[in-house]
């Protein structure tokens, strides 16, 4: 079988679903490559994460589509989801990516995760995600601290030769002094990330920054995502975080 893969968003961030699809087809002996509109394929897959990404009008009508960008909440079949990712699709990616948990306990109106994945649940261990050729792991969990399994995996990585990044941000409401102590013992690729999406959560985020500081994590090692719905209110949050010494990004 001749298989074409289409990364609709083309953000240079590896698409985990496409990497697993590639790995599964290659394990069946199929030929897999990036989709070329000039060629004919037996099967074409297209993944789209973001709703603002334009749809490609040249994809064949029988393309198998997936992702929230298409308004679809479909999941990979179990036999494909179980595959280790095919990192050869993204040769510039030198780290592992994956999830320790799926789902979330929150129901933020701007987030599709609870509708798509349901409540929080265990998914993988860190050993299953780690690449043999890299010590760096980028976790994409939506709320890893809300799951006992997630906390157990964090504990298990302490003292190991791995560096981590929870790139979706940690839930500041779940960061206690004990959790801050646990997180501070990890080796981080660069930042500890959190989100500050509303005015109400700002004091909680500032408390978490202070707890990290007590454990030896300098504020500049904390990165905070800012959801901008009202520019003036978001600016006030950004200024407060700046004064606390944290890095930040509006989105």
Please provide the spans of the model-predicted regions:
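A short, structured N-terminal alpha-helical element that caps or precedes a catalytic domain
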Residues: 1-65, 71-72
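Core AdoMet radical
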Residues: 10, 45-48, 112-208, 219-229, ...
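Canonical Radical SAM [4Fe-4S] cluster-binding loop centered on the CxxxCxxC motif
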Residues: 17, 92-128
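Short, charged, surface-exposed secondary-structure boundary motifs
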Residues: 42-44, 56, 72-79, 109, ...
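Ser/Thr/Gly-rich flexible loops in soluble cytosolic domains mediating phosphotransfer, phosphorylation
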Residues: 64-89
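Catalytic cores of alpha/beta
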Residues: 228-245
């Amino acid at each position: 079988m001749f298989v074409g893969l289409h990364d609709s968003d083309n953000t240079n961030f590896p698409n985990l679903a496409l990497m697993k699809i590639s790995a599964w087809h290659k394990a069946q002996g199929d030929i897999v490559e990036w989709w070329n509109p000039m060629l004919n394929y037996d099967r074409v897959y297209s993944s789209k994460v973001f709703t603002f990404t334009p749809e490609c009008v040249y994809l064949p009508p029988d393309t198998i589509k997936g992702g929230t960008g298409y308004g679809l909440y479909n999941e990979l079949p179990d036999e494909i989801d179980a595959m280790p990712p095919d990192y050869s699709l993204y040769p510039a990616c030198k780290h592992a990516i994956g999830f320790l948990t799926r789902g979330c306990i929150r129901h933020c109106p701007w987030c599709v995760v609870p509708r798509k994945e349901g409540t929080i649940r265990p998914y993988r261990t860190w050993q299953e995600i780690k690449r043999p050729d890299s010590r760096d792991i980028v976790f994409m969990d939506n709320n890893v601290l809300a799951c006992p399994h997630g906390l157990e995996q964090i504990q298990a990585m302490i003292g190991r030769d791995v560096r981590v990044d929870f790139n979706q941000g940690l839930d500041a409401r779940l960061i206690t002094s004990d959790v801050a102590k646990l997180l501070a013992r990890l080796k981080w690729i660069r930042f500890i990330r959190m989100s500050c999406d509303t005015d109400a959560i700002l004091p909680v985020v500032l408390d978490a920054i202070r707890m990290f500081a007590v454990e030896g994590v300098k504020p500049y090692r904390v990165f905070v995502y800012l959801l901008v719905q009202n520019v003036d209110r978001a600016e006030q949050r950004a200024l407060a975080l700046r004064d606390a010494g944290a890095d930040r990004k509006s989105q």
